[in-house]
Amino acid sequence: MSNYDVIIAGAGHNGLVAASYLAKAGKKVLVLEAQEVIGGATQSVKAFEDYEARLSRYSYLIALLPDKIIKDLGLNFQNLSREISSFTPYTNQSKEESGLLVSRKWDSRTDDSFYQLTGSRKEAEAWQEFYGEVEKFASRIAPTLLEPLKSSAELNTHISMPQAWDYLIENPIGNVIVEKFKNDLVRGVVLTDALIGTLSSAYGMQANNCFLYHLIGNGTGEWKVPKGGMGAFVSELNRVATSHGVQIECSSKIIDIDADLNGVQVTDINNRKFTAKYFLSNAAPEFVSSKIENRSSLEGAQIKINMLLKRLPRLKSGIDPKLAFAGTLHLNESFSELERAYDQAVIGNIPDVLPSEMYCHTLTDPSILSPELQSEGFQTLTLFGLHTPASAFEESNKASTKIVLEKAISGLNNYLAEPLEEVLAMDKHGKPCIEAKSPLDLEADVFLPRGNIFHKDLTLPFAESDDEVGKWGVETNLPNVFICGASAKRGGGVSGIPGHNAAMAVLYS
């Protein structure tokens, strides 16, 4: 029986962050990974066998990863900014095709785009005022994510923005969106950040939690492209972890843990037993042990579609595709469309009109393609469909996934000057290079419970009881057992935050 200071379940990015911090502090660390490869939902894969293109199959953008973690661990890794924040095509009252273009840094074309949509400057001014407040709020709350939990009163005082606290924390996000914005399309673009991976109405408080995490990342809320794809990020974490002596064992699914005040004993699927003073779970608790208390949560409600294109398709509006697809392209995501889709999804149905958003990784970072594919003009396209609950796939995952895929393509084709099918790359068997991953696929492939990309419902980033104040938000009902993955407080997204916080809980215990 081998003995360690710390055993970690799962070699996803959070597990590797925790392992790196602990090993750097001199701890003997073992990471047990159930799959044959490391990375979990942050791996890159050659999704289409005939082409040298390594796609981020599951997670695909990074906003929440603090610069402090990159600096602390000495990660040689780069996140790239996108010139365009978003583009939302629409058909105006004269049946003309147009679109709302929002640059990452506000400019005249963004100003003109808002005016063309709304006929006034008021919506653009409201946008700048609202996101200015949110960015200020983010800059004050972001550093606290790597500190012990404060009470809500302490955090409110620390941030010292009572009005923003009220509409971001206390009241449904839908209220402030409707109050501050008058255009249905603009309202929807704002609302999408509250719904990524979250089955909620605009007036459900889970939407607030999701919105908060999507907008506070690294104090700016900017969503960046990982250079080299998610796999490059994981490879760098692996390099750092192993350089400090971390031992990583793949194909080693944990089947049992015993924990008491003296430490933990872990048994893996190969019937090997390991002991340690501490145990950290990067995996969702239900996939590790029934002994770890679990809170009930919403099921996953998104579909991820990956594509390889011979070139980007032309749009009816005439906008340069390299602008339209560089940021997030919103489809069927007006406020009213999102609410209608939720009403259908919450009773287990696939929405008639699928809200979705997409972006092209290779416009910002072509390095995930071989030089040959780059020279030939190939591009990748990622689509993320909202309000597709796991329950809608249970009767037949394959059939339901096909239906959603068809809806997604149809929704995009409505705004294209040529069908998507004409620009999809084809493999040697004549099949289009497109794949779709439903919530049930995410559960089967990377152990996300019911396809919930956050493992559990996101929680607000402060202590919700007196007992939690001063703790790290990673504690469990078992002694010496901590959560270092997405289901920890302040977990969710590609952040490394719960990995850091679990490591701190060990080092300061």
Segments (PLM) and residue ranges:
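N-terminal glycine-rich phosphate/pyrophosphate-binding loop and immediately adjacent elements
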Residues: 2-140
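Rossmann-like flavin
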Residues: 95-204
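A glycine-rich dinucleotide-binding beta-alpha-beta segment and adjacent secondary-structure elements
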Residues: 183, 187-199, 353-359, 418-489
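Helical element adjacent to the flavin cofactor pocket in flavoenzyme catalytic cores
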Residues: 214-263
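Beta-rich nucleic-acid/ligand-interaction surfaces
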Residues: 247-248, 252-268, 427-444
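Mid-domain catalytic core of redox enzymes
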Residues: 253-373
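Conserved FAD/dinucleotide-binding core of flavoprotein oxidoreductases
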Residues: 286, 308-310, 373-408
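A conserved FAD-binding loop/helix module that cradles the flavin
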Residues: 486-507
